[in-house]
Amino acid sequence: MAHLLLLHGPNLNLLGTREPEIYGRITLPQIDAALAERAATAGHGLSSLQSNAEHVLIERIHATREDGTAFILINPGAFTHTSVALRDALLAVALPFVEIHLSNPHTREPFRHHSYLADKALGVVCGFGVDSYRIALEGVIARLGSDV
């Protein structure tokens, strides 16, 4: 059994009500519950954290050095385009990670086209709405080789 960490960046606590035409109507607790259930079905544990504060996400990433986390799934939200610190934290712990986005940043404003994480991620899943999370998790499960 592997432990997976799912991180959500700024404004994702507003899912379901914030710009539903872009992000959909499903809430973050619904996403977390569905992913935890799928991970458990595959024999893995999954914990999640959402924060609007960059330092909280960084501290949680640092904690993976000692808590047995095997893989990180992260939707960094707007930190994708601004946070060298988040990139450095992910590199410091040297765990594989997948970058996730509900929308496709490349079809949006030009400032959203650059990611500070993508070149270091195992993969990037974007543009599939809530299914972006599911697709990313399935990829991680396949990488771990324990899909049941």
UniProtKB/Swiss-Prot annotation:
HAMAP family (alphabetical): AroQ
Cited Pfam families: DHquinase_II
Marked site (Transition state stabilizer) residue numbers: 18
Bilayer-spanning residue ranges: none
Biological process terms in GO annotation: amino acid biosynthetic process; aromatic amino acid family biosynthetic process; chorismate biosynthetic process; quinate catabolic process
Family: Belongs to the type-II 3-dehydroquinase family.
Entry keyword set: Amino-acid biosynthesis, Aromatic amino acid biosynthesis, Lyase
Pathway: Metabolic intermediate biosynthesis; chorismate biosynthesis; chorismate from D-erythrose 4-phosphate and phosphoenolpyruvate: step 3/7
Residue positions binding substrate: 75, 81, 88, 102-103, 112
Species whose genome carries this gene: Xylella fastidiosa (strain Temecula1 / ATCC 700964)
GO molecular function: 3-dehydroquinate dehydratase activity
Function: Catalyzes a trans-dehydration via an enolate intermediate.
Catalytic activity: 3-dehydroquinate = 3-dehydroshikimate + H2O
Enzyme Commission number: 4.2.1.10
PROSITE patterns xrefs: DEHYDROQUINASE_II
Active-site residues from the entry: 23, 101
Assembly with partners or alone: Homododecamer.
Coiled coil residues, start to end: none
tRNA-binding among keywords: no
UniProt protein name: 3-dehydroquinate dehydratase
Keyword Aminoacyl-tRNA synthetase on entry: no
